[in-house]
Regions:
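Positively charged n-region of N-terminal signal peptides that target proteins for export
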Residues: 1-5
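Cyclophilin-like peptidyl-prolyl cis-trans isomerases
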Residues: 19-300
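Bacterial N-terminal signal peptides
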Residues: 6-16
């Protein structure tokens, strides 16, 4: 006599067992939890020759240049930083929900304008560049301003499959110009401090982004309507200095690291934001906008 047929019949008659723990859905981790667990290899230090320290009375703003998108402007900005062009100048514009702008407030007055030293007085417009040759990490979601969006290095980028361009996200650094598209030289710069004005993409040369210190710029007192330029020079925010990190001894450089946008950690953090299902969120969006993805930065 054998028990096998009886055991088989009994097994078939029982309700299915719950999924094994290994098959259960993974517990949701927030983007911050994912970032906190990132291995050291997922972080990198921006190149010192592309890092600017903007020192204000209230603290330091750290900026990263993007020479892969605007090489001529980045080179000119480096020249002006080495020659201390911005030292003693000011933030002379703060427009609500738009930008702060800084440089020489008297630049249009030849009698008062500060010399740009050995910087080039004319540069080509650098609105976009070929996508080929860039390591483009694409996002899965549709965008109203570009057929494709994603990241190249530390920068949010739009693309049409042929060309790529930097996006006007919060913290983007752009080179102010007049009506002529090639009228920017990098002496007058602005930082986006409001909702992302993506209509400016491919209309102005973007040269980098703020990595740290946005709170020092976004809280500057707004200038008068309609454009935010201060009428009273006393209302401007003085710039103590803008310095290239590469001009300082290594011991004096800020030990800043940025999460690699081509890392699994970054991809997982983006997905956690796209489909947030924690105790507060009742419906996952299943979508994320390019400019709603913060770039994780840390000081070591």
């Amino acid at each position: 006599m054998t028990l096998r047929p009886c055991l088989l019949a009994l097994a078939l008659s029982l309700p299915p067992l719950p999924l094994l723990a290994a098959d259960a859905p993974a517990k949701y981790r927030s983007a911050q939890e994912i970032i906190d667990a990132a291995p050291a290899s997922d972080w990198h230090t921006p190149a010192a020759e592309n890092t600017l320290y903007m020192d204000l009375e209230g603290g330091r703003v750290i900026i990263e240049l993007a020479p892969q998108f605007a090489p001529e402007h980045a080179s000119n900005i480096r020249t002006m930083a080495r020659e201390h062009f911005w030292d003693g100048l000011s933030i002379y514009r703060s427009q609500d929900n738009f930008v702060v702008q800084f440089g020489d407030a008297d630049a249009d007055d030849a009698a008062k304008a500060k010399s740009m030293g050995s910087a080039k007085p004319h540069l080509p417009a650098e609105f976009q560049r070929p996508l080929q040759g860039l390591a483009f990490t694409a996002l899965p979601d549709r965008d109203g301003w570009a057929p494709r969006t994603g990241f190249v290095g530390d920068f949010p980028v739009g693309s049409d499959g042929k060309n790529a361009w930097l996006a006007h996200c919060y913290g983007a650094l752009g080179a102010g110009r007049n009506n002529d598209e090639d009228s920017s030289v990098g002496a007058e710069l602005y930082v986006v401090t409001g909702q992302s004005p993506r209509q400016l993409d491919r209309n102005i040369t973007l040269v980098g982004r703020v990595l740290k210190g946005m709170e020092l710029l976004s809280t500057i007192k707004r200038g008068p309507d309609p454009m935010g330029f201060y009428e009273d020079p006393a209302q401007r925010t003085p710039i103590k200095a803008i310095t290239l990190a590469s001009e300082l001894p290594e011991a004096q450089r800020v030990k800043l690291q940025v999460l690699r946008t081509d890392s699994k950690t970054f991809a997982d953090a983006v997905e956690a934001r796209r489909n947030r299902v924690d105790g507060f969120y009742k419906r996952a969006a299943g979508h994320i906008d390019l400019c709603n993805i913060p770039l994780p930065v840390r000081i070591r």
